[in-house]
A protein has these predicted regions:
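Acidic/polar alpha-helix N-cap and adjacent early helical turns
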Residues: 96-100
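AMP-binding/adenylate-forming catalytic core of the ANL superfamily
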Residues: 1-69, 77-80, 85-94
Length: 100
């Protein structure tokens, strides 16, 4: 992800989000942005009966990530996976483009 000329590792953001007590899985992809070029967009699968809000997730990330690395949006959903359990990021990229 390249946001405002800064390279951002999606894995670093995913690892930060995954430490939240309500998060089961997280995946981060680039979301097109007019001002910054791209911004991090997080897709989060929550643990059953452990709710969380977009603000909670972003505030949680703020404790360990630099401001420019914070996800600008968080979408809660079941993450698409292959038969071996790998997250299908290409499907998430398609979903982000539909939402933009």
């Amino acid at each position: 992800i390249i946001s405002g000329g800064e390279n951002i590792s999606s894995i670093e953001i995913e690892n930060a989000i995954a430490k939240h007590p309500s998060v089961s899985l997280a995946a981060v992809v680039a979301k097109p942005d007019e001002k910054w070029g791209e911004t991090p967009c997080a897709f989060v699968e929550l643990i059953k009966d452990k709710p969380a809000t977009e603000k909670e997730i972003i505030d949680f990330c703020r404790e360990t990530l630099a401001g420019f690395k914070l996800p600008k949006s968080v979408i809660f959903c079941d993450l698409p996976k292959t038969s071996t359990g790998k997250i299908q990021k290409f499907e998430l990229r398609k979903k982000v483009k539909e939402l933009s």
